[in-house]
Amino acid sequence: MESGAYGAPRAGGSFDLRRFLKQPQVVVRAVCLVFALIVFSCIFGEGYSNTHDSQQQYCVFNRNEDACRYGSAIGVLAFLASAFFFVVDIYFPQISNATDRKYLVIGDLLFSALWTFLWFVGFCFLTNQWAATKKNDVHVEADSARAAITFSFFSIFSWCVLAFLAYQRYKAGVDEFIQNYVDPTPDPSTAYASYPGVPADTYQQPPFTQNAESTEGYQPPPVY
């Protein structure tokens, strides 16, 4: 197995912080983490309100609890996933098994693609509910609601970039495997090698063959 596969140097080297921070997926992942933090913080902090004559809180997005739950859920999960893959990026160069690297890159690719779609759905959902919200239901929470919608929109592109970078790393690993692959099919022009421990064919002429051949020919008849 090649240890320097899937967009990372060979295992066993020392950790280089400067080189790590310059990696594109690390930079974009940090951006995704910040965007997710802003979204669920805005919803948790000021996404709920109540009227003066009631202490019961409601979601500022058209009083639709599902809108606040959805935005909070994808924000929290995106934050946790970004932190997890950030740790994976730190230890990724220390992984010497190319198969383990492949599975981690595939997981990053699939999760990033899925969350790109979920952020798109969340942006459309929150925007639709915000447009249907009555002005009387909005007080000081308007800025937080708009911030949640805005950074949900930005998260679509940041997670899309993460998916693209993961695909590039996966493709680089596959191309390197194909390049280093050696076809085990033997050359038909070469003779088959004998098994180890089996002596070579040392055929010897049977005894008495030469004497029998030398006596062949004309022989005088027997004398009675």
Curated annotation (Swiss-Prot):
May be tyrosine phosphorylated by Src. Residues 20-171 form the MARVEL domain. Residues 202-217 have a biased composition (Polar residues). It comes from the Eukaryota. One of its GO terms (cellular component) is synaptic vesicle membrane. The chain crosses the membrane at residues 26-46, 73-93, 105-125, 147-167. Residues 196-224 are annotated as: Disordered. It is found in: Cytoplasmic vesicle membrane; Cytoplasmic vesicle, Secretory vesicle, Synaptic vesicle membrane. Pfam families: MARVEL (PF01284). GO terms for biological process: regulated exocytosis; synaptic vesicle membrane organization. Keywords: Acetylation, Cytoplasmic vesicle, Membrane, Phosphoprotein, Synapse, Transmembrane, Transmembrane helix. The modification N-acetylmethionine is found at residue 1. May play a role in regulated exocytosis. In neuronal cells, modulates the localization of synaptophysin/SYP into synaptic-like microvesicles and may therefore play a role in the formation and/or the maturation of this vesicles. May also play a role in GLUT4 storage and transport to the plasma membrane. Belongs to the synaptogyrin family. This is Synaptogyrin-2. It comes from Bos taurus (Bovine). The gene is SYNGR2.
